[in-house]
Amino acid sequence: MAIKRRKISVIGSGFTGATTALMVAQKELGDVVLLDIPNMEGPTKGKALDMLESTPVQGVDSTITGTSSYEDTKDSDVVVITAGIARKPGMSRDDLVATNAKIMKSVTKEVVKYSPNSYIIVLTNPADAMTYTVYKESGFPKNRVIGQSGVLDTARFRTFVAQELNVSVEDVTGFVLGGHGDDMVPLIRYSAAGGVPLTKLIAPERIEEIVERTRKGGGEIVGLLGNGSAYYAPAASLTQMVEAILKDKKRIIPTIAYLEGEYGQHDLYLGVPTILGGDGIEKVIELDLTEEEKAQLDKSVQSVRNVMAALPAE
Ligand SMILES: NC(=O)C1=CN([C@@H]2O[C@H](COP(=O)(O)OP(=O)(O)OC[C@H]3O[C@@H](n4cnc5c(N)ncnc54)[C@H](O)[C@@H]3O)[C@@H](O)[C@H]2O)C=CC1
Ligand SMILES: O=C([O-])CC(=O)C(=O)O
């Protein structure tokens, strides 16, 4: 049988969705379908066509199609969900929960109907609770429903550390644990530059400032943009996750994963280090935590559980 290109559908053609579609196509990961609600069909088709017309210049053979019909997403290998509302200055991600939970449910029904074997990656905020909502609604196994927070949060941390040390971002590694909120837990003990622990390179007070900036990294961009939230780094993060799955790379990266006892948590989606490969989340990696790290993680878990308690009833 002829080998076919992979198919990636991106639901929501706003800032994050459109940017993800472009980045995924530029990496030639497969053919991309960009979907939004019927009211947005014109702009969605327009963005997709504009991106498609960039492919000859870029030298990539990925198609990009804009649509408002789920028929066009049929048999996707990976579906990325970015549909929903974004926060504005003065709002927290948690303020989006009621509206976006409804959107997650309706989107998931269609994704399951048309792409029953897909891997779903959820970006929509509040991301931990929205990934949980999609998991429950889909009935998919836990490895096939994955949320995005840690690649982005870690990328922000790595950016700030590289700036501080004036070294390549490539050589800085880090791990951010916990919910995608201001209580997230950047794990300094597991962070390094060129393999050298950060604690040997940066003074504790500066590390604390970098941690604080990372925690509030989303809010910093919201404040600067004035009318929406970050999209370039989020799209790059989603693209890395799509690539890890489609190329079965078995990347060790933090994702929002379903926990059944790991880190002492049950029935919860939370940001943790995972192995992401051809079967989605192939493993949750459990790190040893100090008492202080555990306390920080517990605080973050409590914040996620508070948001989950605000999820609309079935
Ligand atoms: N987890 C993370 O790290 C990040 C999460 N986000 C979240 O991603 C979401 C999207 O952000 P942006 O793209 O900037 O927002 P945006 O407002 O630019 O785009 C959202 C799009 O979703 C569409 N949409 C709404 N309901 C829909 C439905 N039922 N079906 C299909 N499409 C629908 C809208 O028409 C709009 O085009 C927000 O909730 C934001 O908070 C954004 C950045 C990072
Ligand atoms: O801050 C927001 O609302 C969007 C987001 O999750 C991020 O950029 O980390």
From Swiss-Prot:
Catalytic activity reported: (S)-malate + NAD(+) = oxaloacetate + NADH + H(+)
EC number: 1.1.1.37
GO molecular function ontology, one term from the record: L-lactate dehydrogenase activity
Similarity-based family: Belongs to the LDH/MDH superfamily. MDH type 3 family.
Active site: H180
NAD listed as a keyword: yes
Gene (name only): mdh
Keyword list, A-Z: NAD, Oxidoreductase, Phosphoprotein, Tricarboxylic acid cycle
Modification sites for Phosphoserine: S149
One BP term from GO: lactate metabolic process
Species in which this protein is naturally found: Shouchella clausii (strain KSM-K16)
Residues holding substrate: R87, R93, N125, R156
Function of the molecule: Catalyzes the reversible oxidation of malate to oxaloacetate.
Positions contributing to NAD(+) binding: G12, S13, G14, F15, T16, G17, D36, N100, L123, T124, N125
Protein name: Malate dehydrogenase
